[in-house]
């Protein structure tokens, strides 16, 4: 008998095989490293000679946090990451080129090398990090660069809700009339239309139509949601006269902390600063409404075993995503090998 998949938490091994947003681009500077966490592991991220780099936040000498150090300039003019404890210095490839206590002619061990993240990249105004080779590519956000779209970002928050819970909630539509009654939910919505759910590779997509309350007016809108083997999800909302694109990016920092990035776009604002501010405020409110429920859960663990909960047809998209994450988790477990008692 196949063992039931373990619940998904913020430090589950599968998150090490995924891209995660870890900072706004302007938060990563060239003068000092920033400390970020992914799945319980700390990384030092900085820019060396216009190159974005991320290393395990430990100097191999005495395991001091590199993020406590700074960026210095070598004799050749190149930028170097420097440990604050004993001054060991590293180039953009993680190679140590100076140990002050040995002098400039000292013999530096090949082991004096930093461990890099598999990948670090910049997209949509965010810095993304993949600790190990990711199963899925960076999440797509086509509206971000679409002509006529006004781009903004919602307030970045830290929450005790897990990345899995946040994405699962983002994919769900049956909670709109209840959780979002004060924003866009329609109280007498009725049964949720079945829509369609498809899985292709490491991505699930759901398409359905639901009512949407825009101020005092209720209109029908088409919802297209996608999520993959990572802690991010995308939605495209098509309403009469307006298209909205949203990317929810979750950084699973530790077992009980997640940083939430929410990027938003719409094509009917133009240069109207007042309408843009109102749009951002509404999206902030929607996230706050979701967190008011999610943060009341006693645990951040998301069941991946379908037998752990009772599902209906309205849950098809989130169930498909959980199945995908269960498959991804199983693949990562096979690569790691079974636990040794």
Specify the residue positions occupied by each region the protein language model found:
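A broad, low-specificity signal for short, low-complexity segments enriched in glycine/proline
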Residues: 1-8, 41-43, 80-91, 165-167, ...
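Rieske [2Fe-2S] iron-sulfur-binding domain
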Residues: 2-8, 14, 21-146, 341
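Short coil-to-beta-strand transition motifs
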Residues: 14-17, 243
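Short, acidic/polar N-cap/turn motifs at the starts of alpha helices
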Residues: 19, 31-35, 42-43, 117, ...
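C-terminal catalytic domain of Rieske-type non-heme iron oxygenases
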Residues: 63, 135-341
């Amino acid at each position: 008998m196949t063992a039931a998949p373990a619940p998904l938490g913020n430090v589950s091994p599968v998150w090490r095989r995924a891209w995660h947003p870890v900072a706004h681009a302007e938060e990563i500077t060239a003068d000092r490293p920033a400390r970020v966490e992914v799945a319980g592991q700390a990384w030092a991220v900085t820019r060396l000679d216009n190159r974005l780099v991320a290393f395990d936040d430990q100097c191999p000498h005495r395991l001091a946090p590199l993020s406590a150090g700074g960026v210095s300039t070598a004799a050749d003019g190149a930028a170097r990451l420097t440990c604050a404890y004993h001054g060991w210095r590293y180039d953009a490839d993680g190679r140590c080129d100076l140990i002050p206590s040995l002098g400039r002619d000292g013999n530096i061990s090949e082991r004096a090398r930093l461990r890099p993240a598999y990948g670090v990249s910049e997209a949509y105004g965010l810095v993304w990090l993949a600790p190990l080779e990711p199963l899925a590519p960076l999440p797509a956000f086509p509206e971000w660069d679409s002509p006529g779209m006004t781009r903004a970002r919602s307030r970045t928050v830290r929450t005790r809700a897990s990345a899995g819970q946040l994405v699962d909630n983002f994919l769900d539509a049956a909670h709109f009339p209840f959780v979002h009654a004060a924003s866009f939910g329609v109280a007498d919505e009725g049964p949720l239309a079945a829509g369609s759910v498809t899985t292709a590779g490491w991505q699930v997509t759901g398409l359905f139509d639901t009512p949407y309350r825009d101020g005092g007016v209720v209109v029908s809108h088409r919802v297209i949601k996608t999520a993959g083997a990572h802690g991010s999800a995308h939605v495209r909302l098509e309403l009469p006269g307006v298209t909205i694109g949203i990317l929810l990016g979750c950084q699973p920092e530790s077992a009980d902390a997640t940083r939430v990035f929410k990027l938003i776009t719409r094509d009917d604002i133009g240069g109207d600063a007042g309408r843009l501010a109102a749009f951002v405020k509404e999206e902030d409110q929607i996230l706050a409404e979701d967190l008011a429920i999610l943060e009341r859960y006693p645990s951040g663990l998301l069941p991946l075993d379908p037998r752990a909960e009772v599902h209906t047809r309205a849950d098809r998209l989130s169930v498909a995503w959980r199945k995908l994450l269960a498959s991804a988790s199983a693949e990562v477990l096979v690569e790691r090998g079974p636990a040794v008692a």
